[in-house]
């Protein structure tokens, strides 16, 4: 595997950059975060890469951080998610926002991404739930990382009780802002939400 490429940036296109190193120009497909601020042509650039080997092509994907590359590889482990869909997901926000959306079952946010419909968004949540570390993630204003972690567990519990990820997300969003951090109490409040419908 080619873990990283460092060299001179010689071209930037809509979906890739070209980095020259050792006389070879490497075409590297990248998410929006890389393409939005690649640096000046002729400047040195380093990307952490993932090489995808297919029958008809060898394709390099590049990322600003190792964490971003690891999340890309994790996304590829989900049935139905190819490299382009994974890039689109990474381009839809920061890695922290994406991990939090998956961990909390935010199917609506994931489904807004190009090439990711509602079914694939639900599959992402189902297959990656519990596999992503969300401890210490910066979250939306007014939501502490502790609340986000408890909500992620609550979402898993609701799904295991037979509710869809979307229903779980809606119930969690309806919890009062002053709801206690106790998981059992939050579960009781979420179930009360379903009973009031």
Curated annotation (Swiss-Prot):
* Chain positions covered by the region annotation Flexible linker: 146-153
Q: Which GO terms describe its biological process?
A: DNA recombination; DNA repair
The Gene Ontology CC terms held by the record are: cytoplasm; Holliday junction helicase complex; Holliday junction resolvase complex
Please name the InterPro entries in this protein's record. DNA_helicase_Holl-junc_RuvA_I, Hlx-hairpin-Hlx_DNA-bd_motif, NA-bd_OB-fold, RuvA, RuvA_2-like, RuvA_C, RuvA_C_sf
GO MF term list: ATP binding; four-way junction DNA binding; four-way junction helicase activity
Which superkingdom?
Answer: Bacteria
Keywords linked to the UniProt accession: Cytoplasm, DNA damage, DNA recombination, DNA repair, DNA-binding
Pfam families this protein is in?
Answer: HHH_5, RuvA_C, RuvA_N
- Domain I: annotated span: 1-64
> Annotated region Domain III: where?
153-197
Q: Establish whether keyword DNA damage is in the entry.
A: yes
Q: Where is this region: Domain II?
A: 65-145
**UniProt subcellular location:** Cytoplasm
The record's family statement is: Belongs to the RuvA family.
**Physiological role:** The RuvA-RuvB-RuvC complex processes Holliday junction (HJ) DNA during genetic recombination and DNA repair, while the RuvA-RuvB complex plays an important role in the rescue of blocked DNA replication forks via replication fork reversal (RFR). RuvA specifically binds to HJ cruciform DNA, conferring on it an open structure. The RuvB hexamer acts as an ATP-dependent pump, pulling dsDNA into and through the RuvAB complex. HJ branch migration allows RuvC to scan DNA until it finds its consensus sequence, where it cleaves and resolves the cruciform DNA.
What the entry lists under NCBIfam families is as follows: ruvA (TIGR00084)
Quaternary structure, per UniProt, is: Homotetramer. Forms an RuvA(8)-RuvB(12)-Holliday junction (HJ) complex. HJ DNA is sandwiched between 2 RuvA tetramers; dsDNA enters through RuvA and exits via RuvB. An RuvB hexamer assembles on each DNA strand where it exits the tetramer. Each RuvB hexamer is contacted by two RuvA subunits (via domain III) on 2 adjacent RuvB subunits; this complex drives branch migration. In the full resolvosome a probable DNA-RuvA(4)-RuvB(12)-RuvC(2) complex forms which resolves the HJ.
Output the HAMAP family linked to this UniProt entry: DNA_HJ_migration_RuvA
**Per the entry's comment, what about the domains?**
Has three domains with a flexible linker between the domains II and III and assumes an 'L' shape. Domain III is highly mobile and contacts RuvB.
The name this protein goes by in its record: Holliday junction branch migration complex subunit RuvA
Species this chain originates from:
Roseiflexus castenholzii (strain DSM 13941 / HLO8)
Q: Which gene encodes it?
A: ruvA
